[in-house]
């Protein structure tokens, strides 16, 4: 899951404008206290049941995942931070039980290609990357939901799996197009949260398009139409190019050994259609306004909560002990083991 955070952030930058190029990554972690040092402030917090994994495992494995993806893809993780916090008082326990990992990065794009183009009728819709599997079903929705709202099995089923080698191949194709004298990309979008439904609908949000489900590559033939359309199998990019440029794109994809699929075309009828000619099914046929024009408005109201905490007792002759405890906190100590 952590590796796909770094991988997804790279794809976000690849999808900037008509294509952009990633340079370096960053990572930030927020968890409750780890239980490593028994003689520190954290030692006063006993082990307890964790909803997911304990903070120590998260900090070690998540950072390993983020760094590992960058190493395999060829992008360094150069900076970041960590915050650990936990406090118990008045029968209340405050802490990060649903941990936070923020993946970020640095990249660049050409100024005159900063805005996406408007697709024309007949333009081809392309998928670059791997096959569809029963992976990451509902991942984006689950990650944004209240902790424990879904069962553990469902939440674990929502975790994506990374494939940095595939992403490198796809990235090389996009890089070749971006660095060309004439970039044929009309519009580009990353695959991630929401799978094909999110990616392909946003590619044609101003025009409409038809997607051939038969043309979407299946790694698992048992997938239902919903699973094919909504899975979040990683390392895929969607783009739109003119029919005359497909030959050039295919040659580059073959050179980089990146799977390429022409899965549909722009229709300019302001409808999004997913159809399966083999099974004579049309699982999705929606007016674009149903997806983009009438999104419900979320109203969030906050209220200030005032809490009073007892003064912390201390003894001046224990000053060095206190300093040692503070320096043992991950939020204070050197963070290179996580961020470099």
Positions of the model-derived regions?
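Glycine/proline-enriched, intrinsically flexible loops and inter-domain linkers
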Residues: 1-340
